[in-house]
Amino acid sequence: ILNDQVQQSLKAKPMEEVDRISLSKYFAYIDLDHVSEYCYVDNKKNLYTRSYSKIPYQYFEDSLLVQQLGSSYADTRWFVMKDYLFGTGEEALFVGRKVHSLNYAHEPGYLFFKMNPEFLQSLLLEEDTLTQEAAIGIMDPQGRICAYWYPEGFTLSPEQEAVLADYAQTQGYGSLVENEKISGGILSVYKQEECGFSVFTLVPERVLGK
């Protein structure tokens, strides 16, 4: 965002072709672990993507990614939606924000990262040890479970799914509930303020009875 070439792309004067190529290379060489695709769009409808594919601007508009940012000036937003930009049509985790010029009052650009499935798994350390007994999952702000690690033979009941969705949509952040007895086990839920995603841990009754 603070890169000189990124800032130059937001000026009123269009960039020279050599500068646009240089900006494409800048994005290409950034260390983007866990990012499967990215898309930077300047305020003159030029797209820069990881695959160097010629994605038309209309595809970007039709993808509805910008609408997910709402009226936020420059907040980073995490959201799960179907990928209509890169052609998969499957649900994926995106991280996006508006990119503003630091010196001029121009229209913003947009930067979106499409994260690969392993990204959410990397957020939980020692998952193999934890999931031998407890069920662990990550939910988006709407309560949809984006990633999970369950003990062998474990599945959530519809009642448990409803309880989790209610907590995910609850206002407030931090520890929403800790060691609460619900049907089928003991539940804890922590909601991250920066992204609105929640992590839950459910210890099944069969473990409590050991």
Description of each model-found segment:
Residues 37, 43-116:
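Extracytoplasmic/periplasmic ligand-binding sensor regions of membrane-associated signaling proteins
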Residues 14-25, 52-84, 149-178:
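Extracytoplasmic/periplasmic sensor domains and loops in membrane signaling proteins
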Residues 94-98, 102-117, 179-210:
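Short, hydrophobic beta-strand elements of compact beta-sandwich sensory domains
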Residues 1-2, 6-10, 14, 25-28, ...:
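Juxtamembrane segments flanking the first transmembrane helix
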Residues 38, 97, 135-138, 143, ...:
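Generic short beta-strand
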Residues 20-34, 110-153:
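Solvent-exposed, extracytoplasmic
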Residues 41-53, 143-149, 188-190:
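Amphipathic coiled-coil signal-relay and dimerization helices
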Residues 1-21, 37-54:
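Extracellular/periplasmic ligand-binding regions of membrane signal-transduction receptors
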